[in-house]
Amino acid sequence: VMAERPTSTTLSLYLWAAVVAHDGTTTLAPPITLPASTRAHPLTIDATGALAADLLGHVASAPPPLPLWHAAQDSLVTEPLAMHGDGTPPCQLAHPHSSAHVDMNGDCLADLFLVCDAGRGRLSYQVWTARRDAPRTYDLARVGDLPPGTGALSFADMNRDGTIDVVFPACERDRCYIHIAYNEQMPLCAPERRGVWGARNASAERCRDAAQLCAPDDAFVLRDGADLVRIPIDALTSDRRLLLVDDIGASQPVPVRVGDYNLDGYPDL
């Protein structure tokens, strides 16, 4: 549980651990107080792949690099997360932010997509890919800027190519848009791309074998900046009136909800 006082600059964190009795009934143990975080809420991730929830964020009493609240016996302890970059300044999580633990390079391991405070009201992002051979270790893969007025980010496969894309609203002056940043990776290998007896044709373009769907593509391209797909909200609504409210009395922005609402196999908004 994350709790915030109106005048506080930190979040108080409490953990009520579930206790399962021999008869299968579940109760909650007394709360454990965790080290407080900054107002940028921690992100729940599984950093080790052990199906145990960890927290990633800024500890209020620690310097900017992102530490990990890691499960240890009956508590969560803070420890550094191994993040190998290229000298890019560490991400200062925005408040609020919509960072995610999601696979961005197609290796079936969840990576870190962090939404960072770039100063002067601007947002940027950093993508850190997980290492299969080293749990709790991430390599910086992509950095970029988000458009002015960007709202909460959502993640979904918008074009059904098997990769996770980024969807978000952004408003400029009096007009709002839905933005889609497509995640482009190597395609599936087609039968004609194989040589005799099923051997791969050396001259064929790079592709992902259907029998090896978790092969990473570290050359993935996230179409941001000028390559973003921008869809005007008023173009989606046709002659129907859509009331855009920029203040609904909540401190957290409302994200775009992605789902297949008409059951045709394609993502809807």
Report residues per predicted region:
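Beta-propeller-forming repeat regions
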Residues: 1-269
